[in-house]
Structure formats: C-alpha cells, structure tokens
Amino acid sequence: MSEFSNSRAMKVIDSHVHLYPSELNADPAAWALKWGEPHWAKLCTRKREDGVPVQGFPDVGELLREMDRAGVERAVLLGWYWEQAETCLWQNRFYGKCVRAHPDRLIAYATIHPGAGHWPTLGELHRARDEGLVGIGELSPHSQGYRVDDPVLREVLTLAADWKMPVNLHVTDPASRRYPGRVETPLADFVWLAKTFPKTKFTLAHWGGLLPLVDPEARDLENLFYDTAASPLIYGTDIWGRFSAVLPPERIIFGSDYPLNVYPQLGPAPEMSRLIAEARAAGAGEATLLENALRLFTR
C-alpha cells in the first residue's frame, strides 16, 4: 500500500493520463510502424519546431514519482483510440497489470475498436472489466474509422450504461489550430450520443471542444462531463471561468493529458503540477479536482 493513499494532503485525481509498455517506450516510431498505428505516431512521436518532443514516454515508476511530486493521489489511465483492434487488447492487458500492481494509485479504462466485430469487441469488454478496468476510452470514432451510430459501438455504449462504466471521448475544437494528425470531430455527434444514450456517462476530453459554450442544448445534457486535458496547449487560463459561467462545477473533471508536455515554453519535460496550480488559481475546488471523478467510478 502506498504511503500516499491515505494522505489528507493529496486531493487530486488526474483523470486523463496515458501510459505505455516498455516495448513501445524503447522506440515509439518503430513500434508504431510495426503495429500499424500511423495516426498515433503522427500525434505522439513528432517534435515541435524547437526540436523538443511533444511528449515523454515514462514507465509506471516514473508516473508514480511524478504523481508524488505533483500531489496527485490517483491517476486514471486512458487507453488510446487505436487504429488496430489488436493494439487495444495489448494496451488493455498492460493496464490490467498496472492497476493490479498499484490499486491504491492507478485506475484504468479499456479501449476498443468496433471494427473487430460484435463478439470480439463485447468479449474484450467483459475481459477488461474482469481485470479491473472501470471505464471505456479514450475513444475517437472519427479517428478510428467508424461512425458514431456504428451498431457495435451502440452495443458498447448500452453495456457501459448497464455496467455504470463512464466513457471518455476525444474531441477536437473545430476552431482550434491545425497540427499534424488533427482530425475533425463534429460537435453535433456528441450531442447525438448523449441524447441517444441518456444513461451512459460521457466525458468529453479537451473541454469538449467548447461544446457547451457554442451549443446551449449541451448544457442541459447531464450525462455530459468535460475534462481539462491539454488545456494550456489549446486555451488560455480564462477557459476555467468561461466554463464555470455556463456549467456547474460537478460537470468539470480535472485531467492533464500527461505525459504530453502542455507547457513546452517552460521546459522540455512533461509534468502535472503546473496545470494543477493553474486550476486552483482559477478557482477549481474539490469537485473538479477530486470528487467528480470519484462519483464517476461509484457504481
């Protein structure tokens, strides 16, 4: 049991973290070529104009040490929206090992690809739940090559409601800057999903591409939550106030997108503490930093 698990000083759950096995970390570009994941490679292995990598590739030990430095009690490991169904299984098995080894610090979601078909996809979800994974995502139908009304995805989202498993979806702001690997994700699709599956809890990543600011209908859909992942790369610090003006704090969930370096102008290494400080300075309280995530996982 970690010495930090009962610490009253630790009041943060980071609900948007990615982690990979050592075989990927050793040579991410070569791994992506071998596994047929060019979109992930375009997003995650490139360098910025100054030559600094867009993200790091820590192992689980490095992640835990960064959590300790930042005062993060628990991290939610999100899967990636892989192009290959086999890669989803590979990451799910890895996450199962992580949460069994560190149940007091790590929570994990399962990722899936409906292109695998009905029985393989649902069978994988059953296996992932048996291994201790508690949510589904990060998914991106638009990046993975299937429709939001895909029959297998519909079954997945119905099962998520039955099992009370939250679903994290990648969202791109339609007005955001262009970057390598950027994929359009029409905001109307997320409204449709929330209305079609009212018992499924969806977390829309990256502030949901500003969905509740541009579509008042979304504000009334209580099964839509919004995480703050990669916030400094996309928006200014005023984003916190803009969201709190239209949504209650119970629908905003803190997430960093670690190990993405969200403050590249301040140094080459990804870390969690600066975004936590930004959130607190903007008035984010326990609801956003801790309690909302806990409620998602309460069945």
Question: Model-found features: residue ranges?
Answer:
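Catalytic pocket-lining loop regions of alpha/beta-barrel enzymes
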Residues: L133-G135, G145-I253
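Conserved, mostly hydrophobic/aromatic
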Residues: H16, M67, Y95, I136, ...
